[in-house]
């Protein structure tokens, strides 16, 4: 086998995973802006790091500053944003990492396509369920206020839809669960529901 042929690798995914002594996965946190995705994702990354797991966090806000900086907020651009994130997550998964994705990803079809691209057996969808009213109350970046005043158009939850996941692997109710409990639940799911 020529390792330079497209799609051919001299080290397979299973070998990479064995070296890292972990099962790779993509933990995809979805929810409204201000729901708590980044907070939970950061706490999860730290908890897994403390368990000596090899992880990488892909935060939608950070990716908008680099990889996706040429995209706006039209439905088409949002779809392309999620496609790019899913492609990067898949590459990191194939490197044997536990990938944590924190992004609004408002459309169910984009989350479905991401799941299919990454592989159903490796994709853990976490719905960070926070009511719009609570997200607006938190509004850490002042985005809801700007959207309500017309300074931001096509803002998810205000004038652009968020399609609630129909069957997420995990639902986190941030009104009743703090980030530490959310992290424990995600790690428990990761330990008991991932293929060997």
Curated annotation (Swiss-Prot):
The active site is at residue 105. Gene3D superfamilies: P-loop containing nucleotide triphosphate hydrolases (3.40.50.300). ATP binds at residues 31-38. It catalyses: adenosine 5'-phosphosulfate + ATP = 3'-phosphoadenylyl sulfate + ADP + H(+). Pfam families: APS_kinase (PF01583). Belongs to the APS kinase family. Catalyzes the synthesis of activated sulfate. This is Adenylyl-sulfate kinase.
């Amino acid at each position: 086998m020529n390792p330079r042929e497209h799609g051919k690798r001299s080290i397979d995914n299973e070998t990479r995973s064995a070296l890292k002594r972990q099962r790779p996965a993509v933990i995809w946190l979805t929810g409204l802006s201000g729901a708590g995705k980044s907070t939970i994702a950061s706490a999860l990354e730290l908890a897994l790091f403390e368990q000596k797991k090899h992880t990488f966090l892909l935060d939608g806000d950070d990716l908008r500053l680099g990889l996706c900086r040429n995209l706006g907020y039209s439905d088409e651009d949002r779809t392309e944003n999620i496609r790019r994130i899913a492609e990067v997550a898949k590459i990191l998964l194939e490197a044997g990492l536990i990938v944590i994705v924190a992004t609004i990803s408002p459309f169910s079809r984009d989350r479905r396509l991401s799941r299919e691209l990454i592989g159903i057996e490796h994709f853990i969808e976490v719905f960070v369920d926070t009511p719009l009213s609570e997200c607006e109350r938190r509004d850490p970046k002042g985005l809801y206020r700007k959207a309500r005043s017309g300074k931001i158009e096509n803002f998810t939850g205000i004038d652009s839809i968020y399609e609630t996941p129909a069957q997420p692997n995990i639902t986190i109710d941030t009104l009743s669960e703090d980030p530490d409990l959310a992290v424990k639940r995600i790690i428990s799911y990761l330990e008991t529901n991932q293929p060997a």
